[in-house]
Structure formats: C-alpha cells, structure tokens
C-alpha cells in the first residue's frame, strides 16, 4: 500500500474564490486529521504553498499546523517559490509565525524582490541576502536554529527518476 496521499488542486483555480476556499479548507482539515495519530510518524507537506496561502483562513490553519505538528510526531513541510505571498499584509503575522516556528529552513535562489520579502519573514544578514541572490541551481542556506549552513543539493539519477 502506498503510504502517501496527494491532492491535485489544479482544477480549483478555475473555481470561484468561495468554492476554492471551501475545498482548500476541507483538504487541509482532512489531511491534518490524518497527522494527529500519535502512534505513528507522519509528514504534512504543502508544495506550491504560495498558490493557496492567501485563500480564506488557509494561513491561520497552516500556522497552527506548523506550531502543533511536533506534538503529534509530525513533520510539516511548507514549500514555496514566492515568499511575497507569505509577506502579504493580509497574512504577514501567520507567515512570520510559520517561519519562526520552523525547526529547519532551506532557502534557495531568490531574485532581489523575493529576498526583500523573505527579510519580512525571517532575519537575514546582508551577506546572506547577497548570497541568496547569487545562488546557482542546488545551492542553499540551511537554517537550523541559530546556525546558518551553506549547502549544495545534488540529485542522483535514481532520485531524479523517482521525483520526475
């Protein structure tokens, strides 16, 4: 049996805002409910989070998931290419809380505007801001607590086949 459950949400984006918000709420609540089983480890992963963070109460829900996940043997992964949406004034408080509650952050290349938005969410030194703008594919900063570690992510052929 496949231990993964995935939801394709592409069709949601052709729906009205109200319907899209309701569907997103149902999926997030259902998914989070599966993560509350303390007898097993789980991962709650939201990819392309910038596409849904501004919908309805999504930011507040995801903030609570990030804050509470460790209590339930859960790791929460929120991935985005657009820190701008997390820094939007409508969700900035929740966006900051998600970043500040995260045990680990992996920051890859961003353009200047993306770096500026990221600094609204988490503290970066001038050197880190410059470095993030110059990263090549696979380069990143791993933030673990107060430690900042430059890393390079290499994908093997087997890994690429698995995710492609």
Positions of predicted regions on the chain:
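Short, solvent-exposed loop/turn segments at the edges of secondary structure
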Residues: 2, 100-101, 135-137
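Structural flexibility/helix-modulation signal
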Residues: 1-8, 15
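Conserved RecA-like P-loop NTPase ATPase core
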Residues: 7, 69, 142
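Conserved P-loop NTPase
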Residues: 124-164
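Conserved P-loop NTPase motor cores
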Residues: 10-131, 157
């Amino acid at each position: 049996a496949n231990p993964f459950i995935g939801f394709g949400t592409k069709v949601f984006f052709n729906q009205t805002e109200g319907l899209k918000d309701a569907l997103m709420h149902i999926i997030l609540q259902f998914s989070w409910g599966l993560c509350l089983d303390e007898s097993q480890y789980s991962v709650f992963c939201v990819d392309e989070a910038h596409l849904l963070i501004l919908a309805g109460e999504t930011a507040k829900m995801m903030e609570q998931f990030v804050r509470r996940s460790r209590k339930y043997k859960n790791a929460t992964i929120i991935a985005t290419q657009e820190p701008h949406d997390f820094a939007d004034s409508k969700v900035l408080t929740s966006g900051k809380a998600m970043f500040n509650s995260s045990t680990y952050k992996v920051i890859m290349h961003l353009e200047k505007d993306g770096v500026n938005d990221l600094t609204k969410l988490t503290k970066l030194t001038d050197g880190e801001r410059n470095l993030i703008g110059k990263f090549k594919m696979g380069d990143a900063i791993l933030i673990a607590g107060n430690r900042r570690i430059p890393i390079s992510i290499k994908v093997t052929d087997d890994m690429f086949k698995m995710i492609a």
